[in-house]
């Protein structure tokens, strides 16, 4: 019995020997050649340098910074290749302040064999790697920080994984990761960068991210707050549900990307926020391209509130239901985009707000284009109090594809500074369509053209209290249909120069025009900018002649007695750049005068001819008046002398002008090729002007003299009536008082061959009577009262050159600014000849 027991004991011991002999433990790392298998660092405050490659099939961590081993420095030069399970190239375990610098590549083949892993409790590690990390095992991450804080990782090289995420941070805070290189992953749930339940980390990457399997995101933040991610490079995903940038249940993060996002799978969104709120900010410069169905460019859903997304680039999608921008059940977000949205799939809207999303703001500078059926440019469904501004055009070509569609949505504010063009001819592709929607405000500064024959605007009977504001630039092809009753309003804010004749398809709107009268029934109004400017036109017509005659009076005040002829030519330009009140006018003319001989009191006769053109407004809200005018008169330059120390002159002028008034009229009933027409009417004006001017010289010395003049004229004008299209403008009598005060100084050179002068003046025009113009629109009488009182402040500089005793040439320039913000520059030149 005893021998039997000994026999089996010896056998057990023998069997146990091989087991004991094959069990190995990593040795302590030591400076010099790299270990053949693995080593550990278990002490503190040591610097190591290892040189050489490691190629091992161990299942241990190859180089391990052990627990409690703090403030060590390891310089590693060489490559590391491992084949075993859990065989990480470098691991850190519950330690602080260690530094790793590696130049070389890492290749692992086993499952859970990360390139670099920080186990829980690692702090203040500083990792610098120049080289690539390649893993092929399941859950073999390139770099993994697990419950570790305040570490810095810097890598120059690429990460490639087959069944794992490239860089992952789990429950880790305040880490800094810098990477120059690309990340490529294969396998399901193999993300490029993943930040899970982690806070206040900073990740910076220069390079591309590419994922090739299901639910593999480029950048993922899950349950993570206050992180900053900076990426310069492209993100590419190829399978279903693989989003480019994905935030889920994450708040107050900042993601900055310069590069493109390309997704190919079903439901693979470019930028996706789900249940993420409170000041997440995503700034992207680059394009988003999706080629899978239901793959949205920018998508916010499930209570993703109060986030900011800024994108400079284009969004392009090519499959069904692939919207450009979608906000679903999310509030108070701001999306700002500079770029275009283009979709080609059925039901692929440009911008979609849906399912109770409220108080969101979308600012877009760019165009929206859709080409498939039921693909609206902007679609609001069951959402309230949102604001959308598009500085660009919306174009749809598919059946039942509206440009702007509001359904069961209230109190939204939408501004389109561009055109809305639809071209489907099936009867349900209105540029703007509302149903079951109330109290919305829509502002349009461009075309609403239905090229397929639908209405340009259509409101169904269940929509009330909506307001459409039409700015200058708006035009319409197709009727303005309102089946919701007179609580819906059309407000025309196009300026005084706009004219329109718009059909409302037999429906009735509340109509408003912010500048002038409007006739109800259909929406009709006539531009009145020329009427408003009539007082200025009268002043401008007489002003160049007054300047010439003032100069003539100065000659007599100086004691001269001119004889012969004189000729004066001038050109003036008016402008007012005030928005919606623009004026651009040009007037040029010539005055020829002759001094009558053998008269006891000096007398001159004169004839003036002027051509002018005045443009009002811009674009489709524009008026033009062209005039040819002739004035003739008698001038008495010294009717009385030594009156209060000066001379008194008098004049009387009579004349007439032929005028052609042209208006651009918006008309939505001209077919599908044009939205406006031009109408014009000719009329004749007559003028009578009589006035006097007092002029005196003072502080006169040999070569310098000062002058002061005060003048006033009474101008009586009459415009005959005329007809232009549906507009009939009644005749108008006008009485205007023009007054002026002018100070001048003249300098003569020693040889008295050149005079140089300056002039400063204040003038006023006051319309005593006739400031109201009566007219008719399609037989309905209305009226408009124009400007009746303006001041003009002028400054001038001139020179005169004496050719001989009987001839001189002169040129004068004058700049004026009116109290109505009209600026004027006039150049005046001519000659005086005594023969």
Q: Whereabouts are the PLM-identified features?
A:
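Extracellular/surface-exposed low-complexity segments
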Residues: 4, 16, 22-36, 447, ...
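Beta-strand-rich solenoid/repeat architectures in extracellular/passenger domains
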Residues: 28-35, 45-59, 71-86, 99-112, ...
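Transmembrane beta-barrel architecture of outer membranes
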Residues: 140, 164, 190-192, 216, ...
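Membrane-insertion modules used to breach or fuse lipid bilayers
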Residues: 588-590, 642-662, 690-694, 700-720, ...
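Outer membrane beta-barrel transmembrane domains
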Residues: 628-633, 637-638, 729-835
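Outer membrane beta-barrel translocator domains of Type V secretion systems
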Residues: 534-706, 726, 812-814, 819-826, ...
């Amino acid at each position: 019995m005893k021998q039997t027991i000994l026999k089996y004991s010896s056998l057990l011991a023998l069997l146990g020997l091989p087991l004991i002999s094959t069990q190995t433990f990593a040795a302590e790392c030591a400076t010099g050649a790299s270990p053949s298998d693995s080593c550990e660092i278990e002490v503190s405050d040591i610097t190591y340098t290892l040189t050489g490659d490691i190629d091992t099939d161990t299942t241990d961590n190859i180089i391990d910074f052990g627990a409690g081993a703090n403030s060590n420095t390891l310089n590693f030069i060489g490559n590391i290749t491992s084949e075993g399970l859990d065989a990480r190239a470098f691991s850190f375990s519950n330690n602080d302040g260690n530094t790793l610098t590696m130049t070389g590549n890492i290749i692992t083949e086993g499952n859970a064999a990360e390139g670099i892993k920080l186990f829980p409790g690692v702090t203040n590690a500083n990792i610098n790697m120049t080289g690539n990390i390649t893993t092929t095992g399941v859950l073999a991450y390139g770099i993994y920080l697990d419950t570790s804080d305040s570490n810095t990782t810097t890598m120059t090289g690429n990460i490639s994984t087959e069944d794992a995420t490239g860089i992952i941070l789990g429950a880790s805070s305040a880490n800094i990761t810098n990477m120059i290189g690309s990340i490529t992953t294969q396998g399901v749930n193999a993300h490029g960068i993943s930040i899970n339940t982690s806070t206040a980390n900073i990740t910076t990457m220069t390079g591309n991210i590419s994922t090739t399997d299901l639910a593999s995101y480029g950048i993922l933040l899950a349950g993570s707050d206050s992180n900053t991610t900076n990426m310069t490079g492209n993100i590419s995903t190829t399978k279903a549900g693989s989003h480019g940038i994905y935030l889920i249940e994450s708040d107050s993060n900042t993601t900055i990307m310069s590069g493109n996002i390309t997704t190919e799978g079903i439901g693979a969104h470019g930028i996706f926020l789900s249940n993420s709120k409170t000041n997440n900010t995503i700034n992207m410069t680059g394009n988003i391209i999706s080629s899978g169905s239901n793959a949205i460019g920018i998508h916010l859903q499930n209570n993703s509130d109060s986030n900011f997304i800024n994108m400079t680039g284009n969004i392009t999608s090519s499959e069904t239901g692939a919207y450009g921008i979608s906000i679903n059940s999310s509030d108070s977000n701001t999306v700002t985009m500079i770029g275009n949205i283009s979709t080609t799939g059925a039901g692929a809207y440009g911008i979609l707000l849906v399912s109770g999303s409220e108080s969101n703001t979308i600012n877009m500078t760019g165009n929206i284009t859709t080409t498939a059926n039921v693909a609206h440019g902007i679609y609001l469904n069951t959402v309230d109090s949102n604001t959308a501004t598009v500085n660009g055009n919306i174009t749809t070509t598919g059946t039942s594809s509206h440009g702007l569609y509001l359904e069961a949505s209230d109190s939204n504010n939408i501004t389109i500074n561009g055109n809305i063009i639809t071209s489907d001819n099936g009867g349900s592709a209105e540029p703007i369509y509302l149903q079951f929607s109330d109290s919305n405000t829509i502002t349009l500064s461009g075309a609403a053209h239905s090229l397929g024959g639908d209405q340009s605007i259509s409101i169904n009977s269940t929509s009330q209290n909506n307001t459409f504001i039409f700015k200058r630039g708006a035009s319409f092809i197709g009727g303005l249909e309102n089946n919701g009753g007179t609580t819906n309003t059309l407000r025309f804010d196009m300026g005084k120069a706009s004219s329109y004749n718009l059909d409302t398809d037999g429906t009735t709107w509340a109509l408003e025009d912010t500048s002038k009268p409007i006739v109800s029934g259909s929406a009709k109004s006539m531009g009145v900018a020329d009427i408003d400017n009539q007082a200025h036109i009268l002043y401008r017509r007489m002003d160049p002649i007054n300047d010439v005659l003032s100069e003539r009076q100065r000659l007599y005040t100086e004691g001269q007695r001119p004889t012969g002829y004189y000729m004066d030519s001038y050109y003036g330009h008016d402008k007012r750049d005030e928005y919606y009140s623009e004026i651009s006018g040009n007037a040029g003319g010539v005055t020829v005068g002759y001094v009558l001989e053998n008269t006891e009191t000096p007398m001159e006769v004169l004839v003036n001819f002027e051509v002018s053109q005045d443009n009002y407004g811009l674009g489709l809200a524009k008026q033009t008046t062209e005039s040819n005018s002739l004035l003739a008169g008698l001038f008495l330059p010294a009717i009385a002398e030594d009156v209060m120390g000066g001379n008194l002159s008098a004049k009387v002028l009579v004349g007439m002008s032929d005028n052609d008034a042209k208006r651009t009229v918006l008309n939505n009933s001209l077919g599908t090729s044009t939205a406006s027409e031009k109408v014009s009417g000719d009329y004749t004006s007559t003028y009578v002007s009589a006035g006097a001017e007092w002029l005196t010289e003072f502080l006169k010395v040999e070569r310098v003299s000062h002058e002061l003049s005060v003048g006033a004229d009474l101008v009586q004008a009459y415009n005959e009536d005329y007809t232009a299209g549906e507009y009939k403008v009644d005749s108008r009598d006008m009485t205007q008082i023009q007054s002026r005060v002018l100070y001048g100084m003249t300098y003569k050179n020693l040889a008295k061959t050149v005079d140089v002068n300056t002039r400063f003046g204040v003038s006023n025009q006051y319309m005593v009577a006739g400031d109201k113009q009566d007219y008719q629109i399609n037989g309905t009488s209305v009226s408009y009262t124009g400007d009746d009182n303006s001041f003009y402040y002028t400054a001038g500089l001139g020179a005169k050159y004496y050719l001989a005793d009987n001839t001189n040439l002169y040129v004068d320039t004058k700049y004026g600014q009116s109290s109505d913000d009209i600026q004027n520059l006039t150049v005046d030149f001519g000659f005086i000849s005594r023969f």
